[in-house]
């Protein structure tokens, strides 16, 4: 299980992405695409800067259950979002 600090950082990044998906057309389009492919709602996997990439991908596969998810990272104050499909990546 992740530390409290990592969980807080994930929550902060998820909150920022939630707001950004309402305002930023690129993020909104990514959420729409993921939801369409998943047949409804999509999952967002926020990634804290200190997290290991292998752990993040493992967590995404568990959450995805074969559906696409959005992996969100933050670098230099900017959000970066990427669609991840556990069947093809």
Question: Which sequence ranges carry the predicted segments?
Answer:
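An N-terminal amphipathic alpha-helical segment
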Residues: 1-43
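Polar/charged alpha-helical tracts
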Residues: 1-12, 25, 54-62, 75-78, ...
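Generic serine detector
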Residues: 3, 20, 50, 67, ...
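Weak global preference for isoleucine
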Residues: 4, 13, 45, 70-72, ...
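Compositionally biased, intrinsically disordered low-complexity segments
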Residues: 7-9, 16, 48-50, 66, ...
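Short, hydrophobic/π-rich interface segment
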Residues: 36-68
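C-terminal edge-of-domain segments
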Residues: 67-89
